[in-house]
Swiss-Prot record:
NCBIfam families: L28
SUPFAM superfamilies listed in its UniProt record: L28p-like
Domain of life: Bacteria
Name listed for the protein in its UniProt record: Large ribosomal subunit protein bL28
Signal peptide span: none
GO CC aspect terms: ribonucleoprotein complex; ribosome
InterPro entries listed in its UniProt record: Bacterial_rp_bL28, Ribosomal_bL28, Ribosomal_bL28/bL31-like_sf, Ribosomal_bL28_bact-type, Ribosomal_bL28_sf
Similarity annotation: Belongs to the bacterial ribosomal protein bL28 family.
Molecular-function GO terms, alphabetical: structural constituent of ribosome
UniProt xrefs under HAMAP family: Ribosomal_bL28
Chain positions covered by the region annotation Disordered: 1-21
Organism in which the protein naturally occurs: Yersinia enterocolitica serotype O:8 / biotype 1B (strain NCTC 13174 / 8081)
Length: 78
């Protein structure tokens, strides 16, 4: 399973670790992902999404029904 938020599309980005001597070594910054079950009142069932912390805030703001409609419009499965 890829490390991508199903709501926001956040994915790993690359950058550098920096030592005290400012030597650079490559590293990845991973999104804060969680598998979370959301109750969808319209469908009377739970839906499990892999979402970032920001994705959960977006769901709180817009509502799960709206977010699922956006995911469906992109052609993603959930």
């Amino acid at each position: 399973m890829s490390r991508v938020c199903q709501v926001t599309g956040k994915r790993p980005v690359s950058g550098n670790n920096r030592s005290h001597a400012m030597n650079a070594t490559k590293r990845r910054f991973l999104p804060n992902l969680h598998s979370h079950r959301f109750w969808v009142e319209g469908e009377k069932r739970f839906v499990t999404l892999r979402v970032s912390a920001k994705g959960m805030r977006v769901i709180d703001k817009k509502g799960i029904e709206t977010v699922l409609a956006e995911i469906r419009a992109r052609g993603e499965k959930y």
